[in-house]
Amino acid sequence: MSRYRFRKARSNWPMGQNDSRWEPPPVRLNELVTATEPEEIPLPKLEDQPYEGGPLNMTGFMYHPRTKKYYKMTQDPTMPQGFSKSDLDRMEKAREAKFQANRPRFTSGSFIQRPVFKPITTLMDDLTLGRCTMARVERHIHESRLLNCNPKPSFTIKTPIEHYDVSGCEFLDVSETGDRIVGTFTVNPNGVAAKHSAVYVFEVDSIGDTIQSESSRREAYQLLPIRSRSNNAGFNTLGLTVRPMLRDDGFSDEPSYLDYAVTRYNSFIVDQTLARVDADVTCMLTVTANDTITRNGNVCSYCTVHLEPLAELSDPEAMPTLNSPIYNKSWREKGNIWSVGWNAPQMSIGFGLESCFRVENLLTDRSFLMSSRKRNVLNHCFSADGNLVYMGLRNDNVIKSDLRMNRDHITGQLNGACNTTFVRVLEKTRPECVVTEGFDSIIRIWDFRWPKNPMMEMHGHSNNCNRLNVFFDKEERFVFAAGSDGYVRGWSLTSGDMLCSVKTPNHSNPIFPRAVYSDCWGGRPGNSAIIMAVGDSMRVHSLEL
């Protein structure tokens, strides 16, 4: 026996009187060993029992305190999945990263984070510490207001046209000061007169006493129990009053309500826009269409462009000059006129025709034609200096034409901007960029220096081959569009995110809703709201932090 095997064999021998090194023999198979003390299984403590929700109060999850994991409650208990708080945070970050990766971005690479609601204290701290500028603080405040937009209107105002039944709104705009609303409404007289369209100018005022009384009434209503609250018509916390501006000259014996309307049209309205002819006078450009039967029995279509002054939006000192021929003109065109636009620097009017584009000078009465690639000019707009015109064509891209050239006016196009029904230049913020909207239900921001791809895309809009209402605020921070599905949506022109989506009542008439936005309604800064003209009412959605 080797020395190693001998040491291993005697390792279990008892060594003298010391039994500490002695090891008991191993238990053999099927040998019974009597236990000296019974084994007791300790019960789990009450604080270690799993319970629903956990510290995060997550519905649908069970929380285990010992493992610190969340288990999703399912109908099949054999397939549980445990998630810790770090797992949930990681999943949320992955979801947010995927969402940010799929968002449209600027082609230059610069990108601003998705707007979220920020308290005033956080914004002021960032401003004090120099982490943001004052312009960004203002933008965050307005975006937070839009993010808090309630789908239900704060209150509803019946369109103040007492002697007619209003069918819908065809045009709506607001002044920069927020104290005037210009609208074209389709009205049905109560008498024997036929259905027609009328232009009205409303005065918007904000009354302080109404603000205090309505705010107190809303606070008392919110203190009531939910079951005790009755249906109310809303709370006019902005103190808004909308009244028509009467045109009573004092010489007519007829009632003043007959002169409510600025003008009336018995023909179909194709397009309308406001034209600031000079610093004192504001006019309205309107395109109407009607059909006539010739002597041979053929149906012939004619379009007429009307230029009419709006005394309510003009300077009171310019009243004696409103009857001047330069402010009251009309042009009759055989064929279709799809769009009309005003070029203020050159005092000219643009007509989007069936197969070309026409420019009419208001001072010299001279006109010339420009190529539109033999396409219908669905919409157009002029640049801030008046030298360029951007045209949205049917079945073709948006083109840019230079008015200073004698021939070959087309100098550029946007690849992918097809069937564009709305074109607008961002004159105040980005004069080199245009915003387009078309039949593909996508609102895009383009730069003609990089015409192959848009700078930004805003999704969620709905358009089914209609010319819909698109509105910009005076600071060009937001864009609002009424969709063919009855929703009015708003996007941020800085980040491209949708900030609000409001569903309007579904009416049987084919007139789509119109929406305007202002942050100084009634001439009071801070009165921020969206007004939607739907049917015979104006739905006011007040925006609060």
Swiss-Prot record:
* Compositionally biased residues, Basic residues: 1-10
Spans annotated as Disordered: 1-25
Repeat among keywords = yes
GO CC terms, sorted: Cul4-RING E3 ubiquitin ligase complex
- Keyword annotations for this protein? Repeat, WD repeat
InterPro entries according to UniProt: CUL4-DDB1_E3_ligase_receptor, WD40/YVTN_repeat-like_dom_sf, WD40_repeat_dom_sf
Query: Is the keyword Repeat assigned to this protein?
Result: yes
Q: Which Pfam families match?
A: Beta-prop_DCAF4 (PF23761)
Q: Where are the WD repeats?
A: 417-456, 460-501
Its transmembrane ranges are: none
Q: What is this protein called?
A: Uncharacterized WD repeat-containing protein F47D12.9
> Origin organism of this chain?
Caenorhabditis elegans
